Amino acid sequence: MASIVIAQGGGPTAVINQTLCGAISAARRLDPGLRILGARHGVRGLTARNVVDLTGLSETDLQRLGNTPNSGLGSTRDKPDPKACDAIFSALEAFDARAFIYIGGNDTAGTLELLRSQSSGQCRFVHAPKTIDNDLVANDHVPGFISAGLFVANAFTSMDLDFRAMPGIYVAIVMGRHAGFLTASPAAWQSGPEDAPHLIYSPEKPFSVAQFLDDVGAVYARLGRCVVSMSEGVQDETGRPLAEALAAGAVERDAHGNVQLTGGDLGMEIQKALKSRFPKARARVDTLGYLPRGYLGLIDPTDQAEAFAAGAFAAERAFSQSGSVVLDFDGQRTNPKLVPLDQVAGRTRHMPDSFFDGTNTISDEGRRYFKRLLPPRPDIFTPFV
C-alpha cells in the first residue's frame, strides 16, 4: 500500500504537532486509501524503520495531539551520512512512500535537500517550517515563533513589574543562536522608554561586556532599574559567540556543527560582571532556556492555525513536487507557498538593520513587525513607583 512518511526534526515547539496534524488531515482528504506513517525521532527512526501508523488516528486524538506542545513523534538533530541515506532510501522504498514530509528548521531542510539530490526514486521531499528562532529565509515568520515570543514578552513584562517594586538589574538570556528575533520579541509590548526590556542584545550586533556594563549603568542611573534581554548567541566583534569563548575549548557541537549554547557559562559570567561593577545593586541573571519553546500555558491560536495550515499545504504539494513550505505575508494575511529546498536549506535569516535603533534597542519598524505577530499586551496598571 502506498504511503506518506512524516517526521519531526530539531528542537520542539509549542505548535509543531499542529503541523503534523495538518499534514495528516490533508493526506487523508486527498487520498483516503493512503497509509500515513510517522517516523519516530526523525531520520534516526526512519533509518531503523521505527515508525508508527497514524492512518487510523481518531479525530479526537488528532485534536489532542495538535493541542499538545513539543514533538509527538520525537526528534533528532542527526545529519545522515551516506550509509544512513542508503538506509533511508531503502526504508522509503519498503514503505512505498510517495512523499517524505520533514517538519523542522534550516538543518532539517538541509537534510531533505541532501536526500532529494541523491534520490532516484518516485518519492517527493517536502520541508514544513518550524523554529522558535524565526530564522528561516524566505519566510515572513515561522510557526513556533509567535508562541515562544508570547512567553518571552510575558516574562519581561512580569520582571519589569518585579524590578519596579524592588529596584535592581535583571538580565534574561534568551534562545537564538544566530538571530535575535526571539530576544527582541518583547519589543512588541513596549509603549515607551520605561517599558522593559530597556536593553536588547542580539547576535546581529557586536557585543562587548565593557560597553554592556556602561549601558546598564546609564539605564540604572536614569530609572533605578534595568531589565535586559540578551541572546544566548551574542558575538564579539570578530563574530565569535561569547558563550563559545567562555567555554575555553570545551565546546559541544551537534551533527550539523552547531555549538551548544543553552545551559552554558554565559549567565554566570554576566552575573559576575554585574556584581563587580554594581556591588550594591540587586542583580539577577536567568537563562530562560527551553521554557519558551514549548510552554503549555502560552500557545497562541494564530500560531496554531498557521502551523496546521503549513502542514496541510506540505501534504497537498507533496503529491506533485519537492520543496520547502514558507509563510508569506502579502500585507494583509499570511499564506503558505512552496519554494525550492535549496532556497532555505542551511541558510539563516537575520534581523535586518532597519529593525535596530543603534546596537541595543529596537526601531519603530522592528516594533511594528513584532506587534503585528504577537497578541496585545494585557491591560496592566502602571505602578505608583
What would you call each of these model-derived segments?
Residues 1-50:
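N-terminal phosphate-binding or glycine-rich loops at protein starts, especially the Walker A/P-loop
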Residues 3-13, 71-76, 98-103, 169-174, ...:
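Short glycine-rich or small-residue beta-strand-to-loop segments that form or flank ligand, phosphate
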Residues 9-11, 39-44, 77-78, 105-108, ...:
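Short, ordered loop/turn segments at secondary-structure junctions
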Residues 13-23, 46-47, 81-86, 105-113, ...:
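Short glycine/serine/threonine-rich phosphate/pyrophosphate-binding segments
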Residues 34, 99-104, 110-114, 118-122, ...:
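Accessory alpha-helical/coil subdomains and C-terminal extensions
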Residues 47-98, 107-108, 132, 143-146, ...:
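Glycine-rich oxoanion-binding loops at beta->alpha junctions
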Residues 244-385:
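C-terminal non-catalytic interaction/assembly regions of soluble proteins
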